């Protein structure tokens, strides 16, 4: 979820032909993660609502024995970027929202987990994770592949084809 990216050069992010709008700006990350972990879904059901002032996708992806729902949207205001997830398992729910990971266990117990902290020591960002960001690491890897003239090994070609096929149907 995010505000409309009004910061883009020549307003290209709001041009469907150049950017693909919400599916290719935000929803691609949901699908990429889903396909890399669970493989291609058996069925895809989606609803998309778009206008001059917003774009939104709600999708349900069915896999063998479970389903995944995803919501992605641009809002016509200064809405801060937000990423979250919720997984339901046989004996509980794991939810990441607002930078906090919660585990809600069967029987009513719950706890907060701080990813990456070992032996009580956290990095400067408080999460026990390197201070570099996902964006920074992604760009460094891309530059490395270009400079070394190497194909990417992190996203197999078949996964990429699956992700793009799903996106083009939204």
What annotation goes with each model-predicted range?
Residues 29, 53-56:
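Substrate-positioning beta->alpha
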Residues 19-22, 125-130, 149-153:
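Active-site rim elements
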Residues 1-47:
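Predominantly a Rossmann-like dinucleotide-binding segment in NAD(P)-dependent oxidoreductases
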Residues 59-61:
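Short beta-strand scaffold segments in enzyme catalytic cores
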Residues 24-27, 132, 154-160:
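Conserved loop-to-helix N-cap of the C-terminal "lid" that shapes the substrate pocket in Rossmann-like
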């Amino acid at each position: 979820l995010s505000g409309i990216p009004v910061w883009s050069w020549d307003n290209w992010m709001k041009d469907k032909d150049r950017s693909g709008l919400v599916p290719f700006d935000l929803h691609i990350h949901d699908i990429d993660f889903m396909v890399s972990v669970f493989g291609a879904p058996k069925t895809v059901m989606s609803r998309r609502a778009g206008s001059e002032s917003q774009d939104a996708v709600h999708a349900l992806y069915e896999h063998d024995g479970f389903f995944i729902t995803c919501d992605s949207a641009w809002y016509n205001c200064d809405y801060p970027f937000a990423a979250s997830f919720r997984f339901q398992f046989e004996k509980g729910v794991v939810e990441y929202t607002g930078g906090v990971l919660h585990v809600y266990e069967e029987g009513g117990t719950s706890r907060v987990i701080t990813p990456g902290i070992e032996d009580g020591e956290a990095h400067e960002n408080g999460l026990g994770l390197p201070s570099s960001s996902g964006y920074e690491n992604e760009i460094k890897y891309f530059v490395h592949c270009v400079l070394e003239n190497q194909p990417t090994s992190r996203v197999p070609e078949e996964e990429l084809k699956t992700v793009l096929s799903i996106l083009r149907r939204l």
